Structure formats: structure tokens, C-alpha cells
């Protein structure tokens, strides 16, 4: 061993089944899952699981994402929804996922709003 060489030590997580690690990671955020994957081989493998990324998606994601959009994995879908908003409800709303928290975000377009005082001369 050369001086200054870093020797990886076994992780206490190495003995856990992958589905157990996947379950633990699914209680975090997409960002935390990516960080975890970068620090441990056991985590890296577990983070690739669709079961992890399915939990980061909103419960109603399948009704929001058009069938014409095909994704190879739930991770790819999650990343896509963080980068590219989807127009929903006939273009009256825009839907995406927050990159940091994974929370569902919806923006209303002016077409989707009714402002009762818009024609009032007072305003």
C-alpha cells in the first residue's frame, strides 16, 4: 500500500439486503438518494431500484404524464419531471417536481384563472 492511499473499509450497510436499503432510501428525498448513491456501492445499487423512485413520484403521476411519453425507469421519469414541466388540464396548468424536495409543484396560467374584478374600472 502506497503512502496516502485511501483503503475503503467495509460499511455496516454491506450486510443489509438491497431491498431493505431501498426501503430506507425511499423515505428521503431524490437529492438525498443521489448523494447516498455516490458514497456507497450498496446504496448505489439500491438507488437504481424503481421502488425507490416510485415513492418520490406523486401518487397521481400516472394520470398526469401522457401515455405518449415513455421512460425507461421511474428514476428517468422523476428527473424529467424535475427538469421539464408538463402542461396539464388543456394547458391551463403546468406541473413539475421540485429538484430538492421532490414535492409536486403546479403553476396556474392566466387562462386558468378567473379574476372577478378584472373588468372593474376601480382597478
From Swiss-Prot:
By what name is this protein known? F-box protein PP2-B3
Domain of life, per lineage: Eukaryota
Name the InterPro entries on file. F-box-like_dom_sf (IPR036047), F-box_dom (IPR001810)
Instruction: Kindly name one Pfam family recorded for this protein.
Output: F-box
Q: Which residues are in the F-box domain?
A: 10-56
Cross-referenced SUPFAM superfamilies = F-box domain
Q: Which organism is it from?
A: Arabidopsis thaliana (Mouse-ear cress)
Which Gene3D superfamilies does this chain map to? 1.20.1280.50
